[in-house]
Amino acid sequence: MSNTSQKHRDFVSEPMGDKPITALAGIGEVLGGKLEEQGFDKAYVLLGQFLILRKDADDLFKDWLKDSCGANSRQADLCSSCLKEWCSSFL
């Protein structure tokens, strides 16, 4: 039995394309709205930030997510894990 959400599994199961920011696990309407206000309107835009900040230290991305849109630790973990798994499959 998997411990990831259906939202996570759906996101990592296919190429990202033009998916909205809210398609990412851990990002709902409220956080998505805050990120959109900062120009992060699509999942691929947030992926860019993830790749810039990550480089084998995803705590930087999680901290940035908490600071930039008020994500809590669980939301930041879910989003980071989702992007990390997507990268493993598609990059």
UniProtKB/Swiss-Prot annotation:
InterPro entries: BAF (IPR051387), BAF_prot (IPR004122), BAF_sf (IPR036617). It holds the Pfam family SAM_BAF. SUPFAM superfamilies: Barrier-to-autointegration factor, BAF. It is found in: Nucleus. One of its GO terms (molecular function) is DNA binding. The keyword Transferase does not apply. Keywords: Nucleus. Signal peptide: none annotated. Its main location: nucleus. GO terms for cellular component: condensed chromosome; nucleus. One of its GO terms (biological process) is chromosome organization. Homodimer. This is Barrier-to-autointegration factor-like protein. It comes from Xenopus laevis.
